[in-house]
Each structure stands twice: as C-alpha cells, then as structure tokens.
Amino acid sequence: GGSPVVSISEELRYVDAYLYILSERYGERLSVEKDIDESLLDQAVPRLILQPIVENAVEHGVEKRTNGAIVLRIFAKKHLYLEVENDGVMTDQDRENISRLLSWDGTSEDNETRMGRIGIRNVNRRLKILYGEMYGLTIEEIAPESILARIMLPLTHAQGDLNV
C-alpha cells in the first residue's frame, strides 16, 4: 500500500514510532542521538529503509549489553547519506553474515529468510535495483565497539551546498 517512495521526514516518523516502542522496552538502556540536516527532510527515499537498519543496530548493540547508544545521521555530500551507528562488537560470524547478505548478485533467495536478516538484505537489494550498483547499504566496524551502517542514495534535487 501507498507510495514506495517517501520523504525523509516521513521515513523518520516510522523510525521515531519504532524507537518509541524500543524505549518502552529498554528504558534507560537505550540512548538515541540524532544529527539530521534539516534541509534534507524533503528528499525522497524508498519507504522503510531506515527502520530495518535501526532494528539491526539495536539487536546487535543493545540486546547484548547493559546499555547501548545509537546515533542516526542524515547528511549530503555529493550523495545522500543515512547512517546508523551503534556500539557493539562484530564477531567474525557477523562479518561473514553481513558480507554474504550485502553481496546479493540478483540470484536466488537461498536461506536468508529463516535467518531473520531479510531486512538488511532487502534494503540493499531495493536500493541497488532502484538506483544502480554504486548505491546501497554498507555495514562496517569503524572502531572497536563501533559499528556503522551507511545507506548511500542519489540526491533527488539540488539541496544545500553539495560540494562539501
């Protein structure tokens, strides 16, 4: 139902609703920080690309420790970036799963659905189909105990200073 594309502000409403549910569950254990370039709020993005990323971050960053922090950033630098950073440790198994999930080559589903990781795989696939191979989702450990999921999209129209 509805348009497959929404504004960032609408997408953030989904995320906020989801974060609200999480705050009910985790209370003080979860801290969320946002750093969002307000001038980008009317940029178009595919519906429901952020929530699975936030969900993944919480699952890895908060579930497994006494408390966790998530930072959500949205900014433009020639392209549009939506980032979710969480504190957490990536095991070798995580790295392997992630690289398998994100290296989708257009072929069969295999067994990802039962791994419950369909969210991040789907996001990456949708972005590549919609915008081309150079765009999509990456997830990497950027420092010990810090994991960054980054969605890169084309900017839908000139906005702010893009030559930053």
What kind of feature is each model-predicted range?
Residues I142-V164:
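C-terminal end segment of the histidine kinase catalytic
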Residues G1-E140, S146-L148:
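Two-component histidine phosphotransfer core
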